[in-house]
């Protein structure tokens, strides 16, 4: 896990969880709850169209649609500010349970045994 200072949203930290098999999952903490970049989760699970996966599987109350000056932003590897769709823990599980791929089970194990405990420990 790495921690990045979010320059657009002062005081907001982006936690990046790395896994050799699945890739990276970027997370922000809002009101003491983790919110995950939906695209990261969908890609880790093997969805070929992350927008469709989020639209089809994640309820509206479990996601925040990215909007400039309204929602948290993240900075990508090229230094560009982005306003992604964030999903909460319920949305995370919705994507996991919606996946028919075998690696969804391993991804769920990684998230529940490493990612979520680390978030709860470091906040």
What are these regions (language model features)?
Residues 1-123:
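An anion-engaging/catalytic patch
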């Amino acid at each position: 896990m790495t921690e990045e200072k979010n320059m657009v949203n002062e005081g907001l930290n982006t936690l990046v969880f790395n896994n050799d098999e699945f890739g990276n999952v970027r997370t922000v903490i809002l009101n003491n709850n983790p919110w995950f970049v939906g695209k990261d989760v969908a890609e880790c699970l093997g969805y070929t169209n992350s927008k469709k996966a989020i639209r089809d599987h994640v309820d509206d109350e479990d996601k925040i649609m990215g909007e400039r000056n309204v929602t948290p932003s993240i900075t990508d590897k090229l230094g560009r500010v982005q306003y992604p769709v964030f999903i909460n823990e319920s949305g995370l599980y919705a994507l996991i349970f919606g996946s028919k791929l075998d690696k969804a089970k391993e991804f769920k194990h990684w998230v529940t045994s490493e990612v979520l405990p680390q978030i709860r420990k470091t906040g």
